[in-house]
Amino acid sequence: MKSLIAIPLTVFLFAGSAQAYGPRGHGLVGAVADKRLAQNKPAAAAVKQLLEGLTLERVATLPDEIKAFDACGKRPSTKPLKVPKRVNDELMAFLAANPCSGHPSHHEFHYTDVPVLGGEKYAGGKVGRSDFDIVHMIPFCVRVLNGEEPETNDRGITKTVAVILLAHYLGDIHQPLHVGAEYFDADGNPFEPTTDDPGLADQGGNKLTLFTLVKGKEKSAGKLHSYWDGQTVENAFGTLKTSTIASRLSKNEPENWELAGEPDTWAEQMANEILPVAREAHDRLDFKRIKEKAGEQDITSGRAEERRQSGGTFYAIWAAATVKEEIHKGGWRLAALLEASLQ
């Protein structure tokens, strides 16, 4: 295996929010896969036909775009997506089959919340998992593509929608906070939940405000989850164009990217692989001012403060290097998954 390629790690140690992993991070995963898939003409032709000429880079952001179409508690949008009519119609049918107000909701398909405390693997417990989380939905899409699951399924996932979802979910499952979550007891202390005592979840970091160290001082970096979705990508790749990054990443084989077994087993392998990273993403932080509300299953707010380490790597630098590696693997794995599923 070759080592990660020499794209400069451009880390700016400042606070701030950026675009979500969707627009740039997801696009990068798709763009790398586009380059890789181009080397397999039959698979590339099949994907092109299903997507009516759209690239994986483009469609990788669509699942987040339709999340915004029916944001919970708001009136669903009827505005068509900027995609071919058939693709739009199939995505809208998928949306209707899995509405925000229903169960399952397509919002649930993007993540799983395995507790980071305790060393569990995905199959080692039940807290934070569901039959409709990302570890279940990736193989569902694989089965649609290989014909094991009919396109007339209850989830409204056609082969076209399956490709679109996989282009996105392969990015999500390589983002550590889409797989691992912190849980707290009634006193606001991290703890290992059980089915009898599930505690209070942090929604994959969505309820925690991150404070990183900048020149020795704490500065707010926004919500912990959003930081990993967006700022880490900007820190990792700076102002380099997507085409430049994708070209370099697609030509250099990432370390330890290949997975064993059938494609419908890969999601659980990827989840188990990213869980130690999710644990470190939390272990590097101290949690303070954790607040809860009676009757709620999640915390309402809290602080996640970077720990001061003598001679250690800053959180921002470590996170950016991690995201660069995960996007690299995600792109190669997306191409391999589509090739294997469309044989």
Model-derived segments and spans:
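N-terminal, motif-rich segments that launch catalysis or mediate targeting to/interaction with membranes
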Residues: Q19-A167, P176-Q343
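Hydrophobic core
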Residues: L9-L13
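Sec-dependent signal peptide recognition
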Residues: M1-P8
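N-terminal signal peptide c-region/cleavage motif recognized by signal peptidases
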Residues: A15-S17
